């Protein structure tokens, strides 16, 4: 678990791991740039890595890990009490599985702004298009590397090839997962609760950075992106919607409202605002991908 500072969400994240109902021993490795102001109990270590590249930090933590299965979680996420036990039980009974992820819904104490962000990510067809953000049910092998996320990821240590430190922040987990397909499993009972960035400002800034990286990876021909039909379909539909905006506005409002209310946990009074939030979300995605692609091509 990469940790910048102790307090708030980080303390809850650490506590959620230490309170796991697991019938086996495990260790928690906290990786930080400087020693953390926390009393380390049994089974907890603080590994120091001054380099703030998240791929470098996680690789450093893995180099110190003694377990056969690596579990990755962020310091703003809370693990379900059976998180470790469920994942390990599946690995024990399925030797072919090399990696696993699961849903990462927002916690129950989320603010209205955070629940708007969750709705934008969780709505099928028009949201993120990512299984773990959509909180899908079931157990299945994923076909798209982005269907699991680093906030909730397990990898057999024997199969771990390292996060690509050249990619750095955003995309380093996708690169690793691609190398492990088709042996990556989505398991809906392997669950963490992940704090969302508040909408609009923090959320849209984060999504902009993510989609810039998507555009850059597309321009570089990375397979996980260039072969992703969802990205291509989104760009085509987005371009058509922009050109035909005068006649698509009303259908867009109705369509996003219907789908959004089916996925949201927001009170009813906020529902009419969802289409406007989706418009900002989609515009950020489209512009970010296009600008990231242009920027990469120019140099």
Descriptions of predicted regions:
Residues 231-298:
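Membrane-embedded multi-pass helical conduit in multi-pass membrane proteins
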Residues 166-222:
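Catalytic donor/gating beta->alpha subdomain of glycosyltransferases that bind UDP-sugars
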Residues 12-25:
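Short, acidic, metal-binding catalytic loop of nucleotide-sugar glycosyltransferases
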Residues 49-65, 86:
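Glycine-rich, basic loop-to-helix element that forms the pyrophosphate-binding segment
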Residues 3, 81-119, 123:
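Conserved donor NDP-sugar-binding/catalytic core segment of glycosyltransferases
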Residues 127-154, 166-169, 175, 192-195, ...:
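A recurrent flexible, glycine/aromatic-enriched loop bordering the glycosyltransferase active site
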């Amino acid at each position: 678990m990469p940790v910048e500072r102790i307090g708030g969400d980080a303390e809850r994240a650490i506590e959620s791991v230490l309170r796991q109902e697991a019938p086996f021993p495990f260790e928690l490795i906290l990786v930080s740039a400087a020693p953390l102001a926390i009393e380390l109990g049994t089974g907890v270590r603080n590994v120091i890595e001054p380099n703030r590249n998240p791929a470098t930090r996680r690789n450093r933590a893995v180099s110190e890990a003694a377990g056969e299965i690596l579990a990755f979680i962020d310091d703003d996420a809370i693990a379900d009490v059976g998180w470790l036990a469920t994942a390990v039980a599946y690995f024990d009974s399925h030797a072919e599985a090399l990696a696993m992820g699961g849903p990462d819904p927002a916690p129950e104490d989320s603010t209205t702004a955070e629940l708007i962000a969750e709705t934008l990510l969780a709505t099928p067809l028009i949201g993120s298009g990512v299984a773990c953000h959509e909180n899908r049910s079931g157990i299945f092998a994923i076909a798209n590397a982005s269907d699991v996320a680093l906030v909730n990821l397990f990898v057999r240590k024997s199969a771990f090839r390292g996060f690509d430190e050249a990619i750095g922040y955003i995309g380093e987990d996708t690169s690793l997962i691609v190398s492990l397909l088709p042996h990556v499993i989505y398991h809906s009972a392997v669950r963490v609760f992940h704090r969302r960035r508040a909408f609009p400002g923090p959320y849209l800034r984060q999504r902009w950075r993510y989609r810039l990286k998507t555009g850059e990876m597309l321009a570089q021909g990375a397979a996980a992106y260039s072969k992703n039909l969802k990205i291509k379909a989104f760009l085509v539909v987005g371009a058509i919607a922009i050109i035909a905006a005068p006649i698509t506005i009303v259908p867009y409002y109705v369509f996003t409202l219907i789908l959004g209310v089916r996925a949201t946990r927001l009170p009813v009074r906020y529902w009419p605002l969802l289409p406007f939030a989706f418009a900002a979300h989609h515009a950020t995605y489209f512009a970010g991908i296009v600008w990231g692609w242009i920027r990469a091509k120019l140099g």
